[in-house]
Amino acid sequence: MSETRFTERAQAALRLAQECSAELGHGYVGSEHLLLGLAREGKGVAAKVLQSAGLEPESLKAAIARMVGVGAPGGAPSQGLTPRCKKIIELSLTEAARLGHHYVGTEHLLLGILLSLIHISEPT
């Protein structure tokens, strides 16, 4: 397969995930921030799926704040991507390739999140 590229919308969702982390005062970018970034991107396949499921960005942000807490809003997350978020990106690349796609879109990132849940629940 030729070089796989992230679409503009996928790149925007990843940037938005960083912004969400900073807004919430978290020092890392986790799967929760990626999900919120996908929802906030607004136009990609993932955003449409999330909207059709009734998951709106502000309600997701409120749920994250309740579950994880809120720190002092700041700049870029100092700790970068969590291991789980890195795994999600890896899974999205794998899924895109498996589907024969030469790009990684928001749909692949959402698939990566879902697949990471399956991997977490598997016995070791």
Where are these regions (language model features)?
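Histone-fold recognition with a strong bias for associated Lys/Arg-rich disordered tails
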Residues: 1-121
